[in-house]
Amino acid sequence: MKSWRAVAVVLALAAEGFLVSCDAGGDGAPGADVTGPAVPSGGGSPGGATGGSSPHSYEISGAKALDVRNENGSVRITVGSGPMSVTETLEYGAVKPATRHQVEGGTLRLVGSGCGNSRPCKVDYVVRVPPATPVTVRVDNGEVEADGVTGSVDLGTGNGGVTGSALGARRASLTSGNGTVEATFAVAPQEVTATAGNGMVTVTVPPGTAYDVRARTGVGMRQVSVPTDPSSSRRITATTENGMVTVQTG
């Protein structure tokens, strides 16, 4: 009787070892987990080491406008000839962030998603658009930059700076919940709205044009040095709850 029990134990252990070896198999092997958390190509695993940085570039033809929605990471917009060009750089640890893009109604829509509680996790976008392309960007956490854009711009982040440089847009909106907002124009704009919840706001326009300026700060200095005319059809609204507000020529 004792010898039978010993044999039974040996058989049970052998069976357990077989199951473990199956679970350790590669893709498609018995026991492989195809529905579990995403594993970074850098060799990370849930709760494990950093997956690294993964850049990816592509071009999109036929789009006439750009709309970017990014949960965590920076967005930089530049201007150039040819079709729209996108470079996504992913930085992640145990879980790789998801990205997707599609052209819908003539608008290229880019979406960068998060990784739950896994860190690090961000998607940095660099997008080159043709001249006169309207641009909309929304970021939860990260910097937003637009350089030389001549189409309308609507840029916003919950946390981070927003910078527009050498803008040729007639209409521009730049917003940050927590961070500086800077807008510099190469040509006189028709309407500018620059807003920060916590941070400095600076708007710089070419000399020689008068504006209806509405500048306000909750806590901080207010400095307006552009020609002002309340009846002007050109309007600049610059506000912050905490920080300095400057509207100037340059």
Regions found by a protein language model. Give the residues of each.
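Short linear S-[DN]-x-LW-Φ motif typified by the pepsin-like aspartic protease active-site region
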Residues: 3-6, 10, 23-104, 128, ...
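C-terminal motif of bacterial Sec signal peptides marking the signal peptidase cleavage site
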Residues: 18-21
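Short, T/G/N/S-enriched strand-turn elements that build extracellular solenoid repeat scaffolds
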Residues: 55-57, 74-79, 98-100, 124-128, ...
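Structural recognition of beta-strand segments within beta-rich domains
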Residues: 69-70, 118-121, 127-129, 136-138, ...
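Secondary-structure transition/turn motif
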Residues: 89-93, 111-118
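Right-handed parallel beta-helix
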Residues: 136-175
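Short, surface-exposed interaction patches in beta-rich subdomains
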Residues: 165-250
